[in-house]
Structure formats: C-alpha cells, structure tokens
Amino acid sequence: SLLQFNKMIKFETRKSGVPFYAAYGCYCGWGGRRPKDPTDRCCFVHDCCYGKLTKCNTKWDIYSYSLKSGYITCGKGTWCKEQICECDRVAAECLRRSLNTYKNEYMFYPDSRCRGPPEYTC
C-alpha cells in the first residue's frame, strides 16, 4: 500500500515520502515524462513496476514485510502482494542510493515543465 511504501522510503532515506517524494520531479507522485535526475528515475522504474501489475490493487493492497538490521524484507502473501512489496522495496532502496542527487528545486515540480517525448520506456 502507499502507506507501507511511505514507511519503506522513510526507513531507507530518513525522509518522509510526503512531502519529499510525493511531487518530486516529473515521475514521483502521479508520473509524467522525462525524469529529471536519478531520484526521479527511481520513481519512473517504480511506475513501470506497478504498470506490470495490472490485475493488482497496487496502491491499497496491504502486504507483509519487515524492517530489520538495515534491510527491507518482503514476506509471504498472494502473488500480487509479494510483487507490490518488491516494487516498493526496490524503489525505496533506489531512492536511498540516489540521496546524493536529491535536489530541493524538484520538490513540487510543476507538471507543465515535464513536457516532451518520453525519454525512457518501461
């Protein structure tokens, strides 16, 4: 669920998903075109991961996971829940690896500045 994803982000980055990532760049939040930096690319990959789970309720399904010893571990559950957890885990870890590229200027970045053809495809 989005609430669980927010907890994973906070665990990995020490920043809350809202406001730090909810409307960051062109992909964090509702998605868009042309990722602005590595942080935004993490959100692009997360969007692609969710996009492959068309039969799953990616934003609201509650899954099993644990946060221990600096690691996120996804637990057992339905196929959908396990896949959603993996999408969220990989994205949260990506955001941690991209912390050194995070730019405050991309917080609440206007959609109008995310125009042009897509730079990447899923």
UniProtKB/Swiss-Prot annotation:
GO terms for molecular function: calcium ion binding; calcium-dependent phospholipase A2 activity; phospholipase A2 activity; phospholipid binding; toxin activity. The keyword Signal does not apply. SUPFAM superfamilies: Phospholipase A2, PLA2 (SSF48619). Inhibited by chemical modifications mediated by p-BPB, anhydrous acetic acid and NBSF. Expressed by the venom gland. PROSITE patterns: PA2_ASP, PA2_HIS. Its EC number is 3.1.1.4. Binds 1 Ca(2+) ion. It is found in: Secreted. Coiled coil: none annotated. It is an enzyme of class 3 (hydrolase). Disulfide bonds join 26-114, 28-43, 42-94, 48-122, 49-87, 56-80, 74-85. The active site is at 46, 88. Its cofactor is Ca(2+). Ca(2+) binds at residues 27, 29, 31, 47. Keywords: Blood coagulation cascade inhibiting toxin, Calcium, Disulfide bond, Hemostasis impairing toxin, Hydrolase, Lipid degradation, Lipid metabolism, Metal-binding, Myotoxin, Secreted, Toxin. The keyword Cell wall biogenesis/degradation does not apply. GO terms for biological process: arachidonate secretion; negative regulation of T cell proliferation; phospholipid catabolic process; suppression of blood coagulation in another organism; venom-mediated myocyte killing in another organism; venom-mediated suppression of blood coagulation. Snake venom phospholipase A2 (PLA2) that has a strong dose-dependent anticoagulant effect. In vivo, intramuscular and intervenal injection causes muscle necrosis. Induces moderate edema in the mouse foot pad. PLA2 catalyzes the calcium-dependent hydrolysis of the 2-acyl groups in 3-sn-phosphoglycerides. This is Basic phospholipase A2 10. It comes from Crotalus durissus cumanensis.
